[in-house]
Amino acid sequence: FLAGFLTEELGARVCIGAGSVTGGFHDLQLSYSRAVTALRYAEVFSGGEGVHSYKEYMLVKLLEEVPKSRLDEFLSDITEEQIREVFDDEEMLLTAEKFLSTSLNVSETSRALYMHRNTLLYRLDKIEKATGLNIRLFPDAVTFRILIIIYKLSKK
């Protein structure tokens, strides 16, 4: 609510980071640090707008701890030229990310993207042909989400 209000009233891009609930003053520094981390991740993964909590980036935090050389190795093993086409096409990547963020819900994704349902299904089929991953299925969606995170971390 607050981010939307500030964006509407001030016309400014607003990004809010939320840390963790603390049991007292001694944990405030940790919570603040986590809020800053959420903001840093939001810039890379969400365009730096909206409200973001530290918890929503737990997988990113875990993958960031893996040495870059291992991530690059994993990415080069998995990604072929066709998969890179999906990652380099902003429209396709946005479609996939929105689909994943709406819990694999076709109707909600098409509404959020102002797109006809059949157009969305066509794009999801195109992603499946390029990657071999049917992101409508949870296991493939998880794999694809991990690939997106690794890809964005490698571009950072």
PLM region descriptions:
Residues 1-156:
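Cytosolic nucleotide-utilizing catalytic cores of signal-transduction proteins
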